[in-house]
Amino acid sequence: MMMTEMTEEQTIYPPEAPTNCDLCPRLVAYRSKNRLEHPGWFNAPVPSFGDKAAKLLVIGLAPGVTGANKTGRPFTGDWAGDLLYATLSKFGYSEGEYQARPDDGLELKDAMITNAVRCVPPKNKPVGTEVNTCR
């Protein structure tokens, strides 16, 4: 059996989920339903946003159905994002103006935002196995 050694970066920063991750059947079914209902939305595992070597890490539970699931950026497009990005700006963790869309030019400074579960769950409630699978 051939073993592949992981680089130091791979052990510190886990890889992002593939666009068509199929590890959680309930989330795959919900994502498929959303893709049919909203074909113009992101509807995929939402990648982390920001600096991998950040001093501040913000971890949400999961993408919101009409927020990050729609836009493809954590906490973007919903009221929680309005509050979070205003707070990050106030304390100097961002540059640019948050406009609730991923192409607004906003950049994080020494901060990173991610979710415990990368795919949007039904009723915004992931189950324990989904959290563990998405590590």
Mark where each language-model region is.
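A polyanion-binding, active-site-adjacent surface
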Residues: E8-R135
